[in-house]
């Protein structure tokens, strides 16, 4: 196989974009010292990785898993969550069904304006000349 084309690999990996991602990841693995599964034949790492995929010496599913693992910053650990979380204010009290509803007070616009009139504006501080 003198030249590797996408058509040689497309039956192993359905999506061309995925093929490029997997081949690039495998080429980076080869650059970092991973063992080759075929002879190099004086080819560069991207060509070797495409040849490995075309000849099925590496599994695209394994490459996909390694790629996802290399891109993960945080590994999610499934831990069981508690069913109920106690409220901060009622540590010793029992939780009732009525406590879960939040009561909101409705305020009219006039009541809001009256409340705002009572607020004093912040004092202006004199500007300092330098």
UniProtKB/Swiss-Prot annotation:
It catalyses: RNA(n) + a ribonucleoside 5'-triphosphate = RNA(n+1) + diphosphate. It is an enzyme of class 2 (transferase). Promotes RNA polymerase assembly. Latches the N- and C-terminal regions of the beta' subunit thereby facilitating its interaction with the beta and alpha subunits. The RNAP catalytic core consists of 2 alpha, 1 beta, 1 beta' and 1 omega subunit. When a sigma factor is associated with the core the holoenzyme is formed, which can initiate transcription. InterPro entries: DNA-dir_RNA_pol_omega (IPR003716), Pol_omega/Rpo6/RPB6 (IPR006110), RPB6/omega-like_sf (IPR036161). Keywords: DNA-directed RNA polymerase, Nucleotidyltransferase, Transcription, Transferase. Its EC number is 2.7.7.6. GO terms for cellular component: DNA-directed RNA polymerase complex. Belongs to the RNA polymerase subunit omega family. This is DNA-directed RNA polymerase subunit omega. Pfam families: RNA_pol_Rpb6 (PF01192). One of its GO terms (molecular function) is DNA-directed RNA polymerase activity. Residues 109-130 are annotated as: Disordered. One of its GO terms (biological process) is DNA-templated transcription.
């Amino acid at each position: 196989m003198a030249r590797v084309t996408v058509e040689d690999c497309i039956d192993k990996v359905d999506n061309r974009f995925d093929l490029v991602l997997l081949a690039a990841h495998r080429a980076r693995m080869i650059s970092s010292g991973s063992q080759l599964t075929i002879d190099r034949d004086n080819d560069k790492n991207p060509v070797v990785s495409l040849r490995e995929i075309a000849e099925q010496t590496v599994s695209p599913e394994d490459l996909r898993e390694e790629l996802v693992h290399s891109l993960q910053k945080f590994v999610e650990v499934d831990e069981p969550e508690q069913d109920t979380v106690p409220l901060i204010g009622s540590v010793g009290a029992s939780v009732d069904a009525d406590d879960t509803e939040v009561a909101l007070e409705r305020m009219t616009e006039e009541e809001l304006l009256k409340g705002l009139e009572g607020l004093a504006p912040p004092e202006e501080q004199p500007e300092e000349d330098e």
